[in-house]
Amino acid sequence: MNIALIAHDKKKSDMIQFAIAYRDILADHTLYATGTTGLRVKEATGLPIHRFQSGPLGGDQQIGALIADNAMDLVLFFRDPLTAQPHEPDVSALIRLCDVYTIPLATNMGTAEILVRNLNKGTFDFRDVAKNGGTNETT
């Protein structure tokens, strides 16, 4: 599965803690991240991560493009709800794309934990169905 990791500045430490805690599960998947988040997670975990631009410089939109191409399976976006973001329209667009394309989205550590644990159990079969044009064939 392709997993996006995004975190606002005040939530980057939460993302790092999360990635360390779930490193073994995340290691089995292809990881993508916005610039600084990806760098910090990679430094803390040693996991390979495809890094895009930072969020304000278009990284959110780059991940959004993968969502629109049905090439992203899960988005972990630790948002800071208490700080205004200069690129809020990009954030809203990314969340909208997750809704449009039925991509699971966690905006906090609690939800991310539920999604990643279920991913580990193999309960994300619906993504295979979506990728295969509505059939449950995985070949």
Swiss-Prot record:
**Record: active site:** 60 (proton donor/acceptor)
Give EC number(s), comma-separated: 4.2.3.3
Q: Which InterPro entries match?
A: Methylgl_synth, Methylglyoxal_synth_AS, MGS-like_dom, MGS-like_dom_sf
EC main class here is: lyase
A Pfam family the protein falls into: MGS
Catalysed reaction(s) here are:
dihydroxyacetone phosphate = methylglyoxal + phosphate
Q: Report the sequence similarity comment from the record.
A: Belongs to the methylglyoxal synthase family.
NCBIfam families assigned to the protein according to its UniProt record, in alphabetical order: MGSA, PRK05234.1
Q: What is this protein called?
A: Methylglyoxal synthase
Origin organism is Bacillus pumilus (strain SAFR-032)
Gene (UniProt): mgsA
